Amino acid sequence: MAATVRRQRPRRLLCWTLVAVLLADLLALSDTLAVMSVDLGSESMKVAIVKPGVPMEIVLNKESRRKTPVTVTLKENERFLGDSAAGMAIKNPKATLRYFQHLLGKQADNPHVALYRDRFPEHELNIDPQRQTVRFQISPQLQFSPEEVLGMVLNYSRSLAEDFAEQPIKDAVITVPAFFNQAERRAVLQAARMAGLKVLQLINDNTATALSYGVFRRKDINSTAQNVMFYDMGSGTTVCTIVTYQTVKTKEAGMQPQLQIRGVGFDRTLGGLEMELRLREHLAKLFNEQRRGQKAKDVRENPRAMAKLLREANRLKTVLSANADHMAQIEGLMDDVDFKAKVTRVESEELCADLFERVPGPVQQALQSAEMSLDEIEQVILVGGATRVPKVQEVLLKAVGKEELGKNINADEAAAMGAVYQAAALSKAFKVKPFVVRDAVIYPILVEFTREVEEEPGVRSLKHNKRVLFSRMGPYPQGKVITFNRYSHDFNFHINYGDLGFLGPEDLRVFGSQNLTTVKLKGVGESLKKYPDYESKGIKAHFNLDESGVLSLDRVESVFETLVEDSPEEESTLTKLGNTISSLFGGGTSSDAKENGTDAVQEEEESPTEGSKDEPGEQGDLKEETEAPVEDTSQPPPPEPKGDAAPEGEKPDEKESGGKSEAQKPEEKGQSGPEGVPPAPEEEKKQKPARKQKMVEEIGVELAVLDLPDLPEDELARSVKKLEDLTLRDLEKQEREKAANSLEAFIFETQDKLYQPEYQEVSTEEQREEISGKLSATSTWLEDEGFGATTVMLKEKLAELKKLCQGLFFRVEERRKWPERLSALDNLLNHSSIFLKGARLIPEMDQIFTEVEMTTLEKVINDTWAWKNATLAEQAKLPATEKPVLLSKDIEAKMMALDREVQYLLNKAKFTKPRPRPKDKNGTRTEPPLNATAGDQEEKVIPPAGQPEEAKPILEPDKEETTTEPTDSEPLELGGPGAESEPKEQTAGQKRSSKNDEL
């Protein structure tokens, strides 16, 4: 028995340890339940959160605005973000960075870098020698990469979300333009790592908008496909998307709505910013013409003046969208000269005429990629701020040939709301209604490799092969497996972009390198030597295009296969019996699914890639498999593979083959006798086929990134440290400013209080002069030396002043509280005295209070009266400038003591059962004897806390009183002090009404 107890103790300890760990995990999880989304626009960003009790809410920034400028101002000793940075664009345009997202993932020779220099010549860009990218040179000692600047913005967005949610947030979904390539997407992910954010997904902004549109219209989506076009023209870019909505059947949740991206078209430079730049140039020209002959400098050479003109151009674009003309005016544009000029909408449209001609371009691209016509589009919906320009709507309406353009979506916040819905769906802390999202690959990706072939006996040559890995407009996320055959030594292959003919020449130059990665495999020959008795099934490379649209090579492995015959003698009687029974129901043997060793893998069921075709001569050299195909029951099944290039493990549909595959038919025929009778055990031993066993060997992989090298880990760590130091510096600055403001406010408030009568009444002239002198000295110090003072010094100065004024403030505060506290004490004393008098007037036969209880209450009342009178008399003798003896906390303590005694008696009166009156033979009530005391009557008293209730016998009540008085079988609801009791009739009525509600 002792041994058993000893064995149970470790188990109990382990159980309690697991419970403690689980509780700790739950508590940690509850602190970080909120998730966020960031809609990164070219000019501004929108942040949304989801937390328990707050479903899908846009975050308000510190200025209570729903969108925040994507602007950063960097100086030597300070940094500004958001609206404060946008305000610094006029004062310090060189240090204020905007529209830097256009530089992400681009090298110095990219046309977009030259365009950025032309648009914002005030910024100095230098070249990173390692990656050949650009960096902002703020000062000789201060430079930042575009990823670092974006990391600052993302960190700022998280701080806004955390302040709004009132809890820490780490998980986020970030929107990116649909046309971002691999280098640009990796740059955003690196920026998020610098900010300390865990990116659940990089979602395309057009997909997020489509998701937001579908989520709020779930009821309108049915099995009939609905094609909707979203035209999104923002500040910097334009994207047109064709989306198909319909319900599909899923394995997990049955019929659910789905959105599928069918076509995408875009223009990287068409947007509101280009219109503003045209207007800025027009205003600069007008200003120069007004100053002609004054020997003035060109306004274009003044960065501050150009920043003012750009801000005015932005305002003009907005106003001219609703008015035919407007007066542009800027005070002190340059050299204290004011600028004023009238601009009409017609002039603005003439300046941007070539831009409006490009509006239909993305529409045609989207239709071509979707292989659809405008007749199949049911609705065209406007998204983005630049679509509010009337000319854009006019040209677009003519291009799509519709009666009207849809404006039934929040053009500014739709992407943020869709992204935060996806964040909640990806988070484990929330459960949302399923909405299937099938995004599309914009740029096809293929695998290229070369191998030696023998065209003629003795003549060998190299043959270049290509295979599409992810086709254009194919769905993602999904994984692919490429199998390389006939390789007996180490080899290389390349991952590149596919056919980009749909891009124009300018877009191809902006796109950058079309070569992604070179993969070098090591250990192929050694793996073949390791398994000489196995048949090689080739080298399998596993690729994954994840939810963020980022391509990765998960692993490369060498696969071998052999036939293994199971010995019938090894099977037990139970195994034979189980196999026989399972064969009666058409099931296979369990031995076919066994794994042999740790390296054996199960057969995968794979399907061919959409749109991939084998070139002549490639069959047998390379096979392609779909590792994790995206489920879509609405799409037709892929065609049956032919030849050696068919995906391994592919099995025809059971319905097409009569419910049996070719590999299963001989086995099933051998297992079943006439009329389905199972064969004898001897026959089963002979007819049982050998099973296949797979062995895999990991192959070494060396990757060489060709499009844009990622930041090395040490460089990334330095960037993270740099951003953390800036954040700490900002926090210290905020803390110092808060301390300085508190000190300054205390000085001003106290100086004013010294002249108020209530403060002069409780202080002497000497005391006021001492305080006033200290305040003046601190104020002088703050003006002279406060700019260089640390946070600790400011807090110490404030603490000294508060200590000096503590007595004065205490006396004033006490005198303010006296009237209210004394009035409350008097009321309580009066009510307590009245209650005591009433209690003593209760007839002796009905008395529920003991003499000790009433005497105790009387003593407390008398003591309180005596304390009050004595303290007031003593306080009247003291001068107002001395510390008072009548303290508000003492008054509150006396009130609490008196109230406690009264509440005890009140509770006793509430819950005491009245003594039932017995009846005589004639049916009349018998009065208790005159000499009956209160202690002889039955009562129920609420016992003090921590003491058990004493059980007392209770006489059975009369039948006539059972409806109004509770019986012993009915539990009484006991309330605490101050609780109100309700009549039993009302409780019964409530019970009856609740029963009626249930019916």
Swiss-Prot record:
Q: Where is the signal peptide?
A: 1-32
Any Gene Ontology CC annotation: endoplasmic reticulum chaperone complex
For this protein, the record's Pfam families field holds: HSP70
Q: Where is the composition biased (Polar residues)?
A: 574-583
Q: Which Gene Ontology terms cover its molecular function? A: ATP binding; ATP-dependent protein folding chaperone
Query: What protein family is recorded?
Result: Belongs to the heat shock protein 70 family.
Tell me the protein's name. Hypoxia up-regulated protein 1
Which source organism? Cricetulus griseus
Q: State the gene name recorded for this protein.
A: HYOU1
